[in-house]
Amino acid sequence: QAFENVIKQSLANANLQPTDIGHIHGHGMSTISADRGEAVAINKIFGNQTPVVAAKSYMGNLGAGSGSVEIISSLLALDKGTLFKTLNYDTPDPDCDIQVTNSIDTPAGSSFINLNASPQGQASAVIIKSLQ
C-alpha cells in the first residue's frame, strides 16, 4: 500500500498522469514478497506497459546510497534515450505483471519515477522530467 500511496501522491504533486511517465525505476529488492507488493502497486497505477528497470540488478542493495545511484542511472538513460536492461531477469513471475526491461533498446521516455522503500515500511517516490 505504501508504494501505491507515494506513486499517486507524486503524480498528483507533479500534475501528471501515469501515461506521462516514460519509465519506472523500481526499488527491486529481489525478494518474492517485496517485489510482488511493488509490482502490484505499479500495475494498479501504470498497468503493464510502462517499462520498469532496476539498477540493483547490477550492484545489489547499496542501502542509503541506492536512491542516488538509481536516479543517476535513470538520468543517464534519459540522456542516452534508451534504458539499460535488468540483469538476471529471465523468467517473468506471473504474480508480477509489469514490463521489466531486459533489453538495451527500450526507449527511456522523457520522464521517470524512482521508487524506494525502507525496511520499516516507508516508501518514497520522485518524478524527474526532462526539460526537452
Model-identified regions with their sequence ranges:
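Conserved "HGTGT" condensation-loop signature of ketosynthase/thiolase-family condensing enzymes
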Residues: 1-132
